[in-house]
Amino acid sequence: NSVAPMVQLIDNHFGVEQAYITTVHSYTKDQSLHDSPHKDLRRARAGALSIIPTTTGAAKALTKIFPHLEIGGCGMRVPVPNGSLTDVTFIVKKDCTIEEVNKVFLEASKGSHKNYVAYTEDPIVSVDVLGNSASCLFDSQLTSVLGKMVKVVCWYDNEMGYSNRLADLI
């Protein structure tokens, strides 16, 4: 939901050779509030008390949408009830600057992706995204560029963003 626009925009403007996604997601209903039995021993731990490394289906889903790209990923469940982010590191084909990357997302938020991508220059945290209907609230302060490596971060309210994308289908 949040990562597809990120991949599309970076690929369209700078070309992507490889990408690695880290989803930092609020704990989910299949996690207990205290340590208890679970088939995944990490998810057996208290979701409201621990940062829990896990898998993400986002990378696999993206390779179906962008079959020409090599994409990997992992997830972290963190002890917040809502408000998540997607952190993506790209190896790009064309040189770019932080300003150029940010401009791509700013323009997309006002144009082609205005229903899906929002843009901020504010120093936000997870609670600040609650109720935001965008699939991807692009955090321009967290953009990094090191040679051909580009890192971007989008925040999202998983329930609100997902619900709005479902409503878009109607």
Regions flagged by a language model, labelled:
Residues 1, 95-96, 160-161:
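A generic structural signal for alpha-helix starts
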